[in-house]
A protein has these predicted regions:
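Bacterial N-terminal signal peptides that target proteins for export
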Residues: 1-7
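Hydrophobic h-region of N-terminal signal peptides that target proteins for export
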Residues: 11-18
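Hydrophobic small-molecule pocket/channel-lining residues, especially in calycin-type beta-barrels
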Residues: 22-178
Length: 178
């Protein structure tokens, strides 16, 4: 019996190696491209809150990094703070998705609207986990505006009871930390 499992295992291993025989050692598989994901990758770095005049403050709001072999962008919001959260941006086929791991304990998933203006990526609710969108407070949509290479704005819209929760909608103006 053990020999049968060993033989089957070796056959599967041989098939797997044969199927990848044209891969070069150390070569990372090609990652699908999407203009929105490529724009997000250019945001890698640390972003601080802007003051009323648009100048950078010392308050770190977002740390963005490229991860998973270039197939995803990880954003850590309010790093090191009690309200720290993470958003992961990645592709599902041709669609750019954002999954927001919220301090509320839910994980809304949003899909980028392909009709977004050229200087924006608008994300719209597309499901999630640990939430009932008809009842629970959750991030329902967000718009990332690219002002220039060193200035972005993110307008988030939270929903509760199946409609926008006006007191939980806000815009963050961020400046790239130099």
């Amino acid at each position: 019996m053990a020999q049968r499992f060993l033989v089957v295992g070796l056959m599967l291993l041989a098939l797997g190696v044969g199927a990848r025989s044209d891969d070069k050692p150390g070569k990372v598989p090609a990652v699908a491209t999407n203009s929105g994901l490529e724009r997000l990758k250019k945001l890698a770095g640390t972003w601080v809150a802007a003051d009323a005049t648009g100048k950078p403050t010392d308050q770190v709001v977002s740390v963005i990094k490229i991860t998973a072999g270039g197939s995803a962008v990880q954003e850590t919001l309010f790093p090191g703070q009690p309200q720290e959260m993470v958003s992961i941006y990645h592709l599902d086929g041709a669609d750019l998705l954002m999954t927001h791991y919220c301090v509320l304990g839910n994980q809304p998933r949003m899909k980028a609207d392909p009709a977004s203006p050229p200087n924006q990526i608008r994300f719209r609710f597309a499901g999630g986990s640990n939430l009932d969108p008809a009842k629970d407070m959750h991030m329902h949509e967000g718009t990332l505006t690219f002002v220039d290479d060193d200035h972005i704005e993110f307008a988030g819209v939270a929903w509760e009871g199946g409609k926008p929760a006006e007191t939980h909608c806000a815009t963050m103006k961020l400046v790239r930390k130099k």
